[in-house]
Amino acid sequence: MRRMLVIRWILAIHLIATQVFAERIKDIATLAGVRVNQLVGYGLVVGLSGTGDKTGTKFTEDSFANMLTQLGINVPPGVRLNSKNIAAVMVTANLSSFMKKGQTMDVNISSIGDSKSLLGGTLLLTPLKGADGRVYAMSQGNVVVSGISASGSDGSSVTVNIPSGGRIPNGATIEADIPNPFYYSNSLTYNLHTPDFTTAKRMSDAINELMGPGTAKAIDAGSVVVTAPKKLSQRVDYVSVLENIEFKPGEAMAKIIINARTGTVVISSNVIVKSAAVSHGNLVVSITETPVISQPNAFASGRTVATQQSQVNIQQKNNRAFILPKGTTLKDIVRGINAVGATPADVISILEALQQAGALSATLIVI
């Protein structure tokens, strides 16, 4: 009995250890075609309290005149519409792959003219188009603005946040479905967030182990193709099983990411350094210039001359060095660099020098 209990504990520990390093397919890959689609449209916001586009904004006037014409109101030629209660805006929205006709989604409103504020405005019916030029949604509603702007008669003004932009919650109604290969394709393709040959191979092996040989095939470092059921009713259950399969991804390539502007340095866990010695020291050079006035004696024939007297001081702090033995890891690198009191800028210089010396087994990326 005791022996069986020990065996169970060993199996449980092994299972936990395996799960710790395993990741689900849904966390490291996305199904091709299942994505967000951007929509955009041009419209008019009305009902503004004198904070709309100024007189002379031609595209706003033309849009307003065209809208009135479509509503059966004729605008005489040459007549300028000088209403300051109207603003031309761009309307944007994100349409998910599986949203259907009749559902609603949020939209963002952004002024493109010189409107000061969209507070209190109403967006008139605006078609939203996709990249293919088709209309997928219609938007209309009251604009919610979080910013505010106020000005005084003396020209002073105060602006909080951005009053020239806003949102309309559930302000667009979907009128057409997005074409999706999930419904008609004979196979499903998973695209890895971070392409890696080892990860793609292990992912296909994990799927084949559970779903049967030949079900999945890694076609390159970034994609795995999986055979899909022909019946659409079975695909949801099938994908639900696939995306929860756990496996151990391949180890990431050794990289060092450096942000030269902020001094941020990110080092992956696989970075290894060959034998090298690093010396860290600073030269402080100070140059002081003092103006010196040369005044001639009284009644002399000379003239006053101003010259610069320069004094150069060079101070060198105590050089400190540390040795990186072969096979040094991330922990040793950080400890060694910190030991010499290096600043982020010094760390960047040290890492670049190590790579130039051929002692750094990693890809150095400066952003």
Curated annotation (Swiss-Prot):
Span of the signal peptide: 1-22
Subcellular compartments: Periplasm; Bacterial flagellum basal body
Any one GO molecular-function label of the UniProt entry: structural molecule activity
Pfam family membership, one: FlgI
Keyword Signal listed: yes
GO process terms (BP): bacterial-type flagellum-dependent cell motility
Keywords: Bacterial flagellum, Periplasm, Signal
Major localization listed first in the record, in broad terms: periplasm
UniProt cross-references to InterPro entries, sorted A to Z: Flag_FlgI
GO CC terms of this entry: bacterial-type flagellum basal body, distal rod, P ring; outer membrane-bounded periplasmic space
Record's function text: Assembles around the rod to form the L-ring and probably protects the motor/basal body from shearing forces during rotation.
Recorded family membership: Belongs to the FlgI family.
PANTHER family for the chain: FLAGELLAR P-RING PERIPLASMIC PROTEIN FLGI, FLAGELLAR P-RING PROTEIN
Assembly information from the UniProt record: The basal body constitutes a major portion of the flagellar organelle and consists of four rings (L,P,S, and M) mounted on a central rod.
Protein name in the entry: Flagellar P-ring protein
Organism: Legionella pneumophila (strain Lens)
Record gene name: flgI
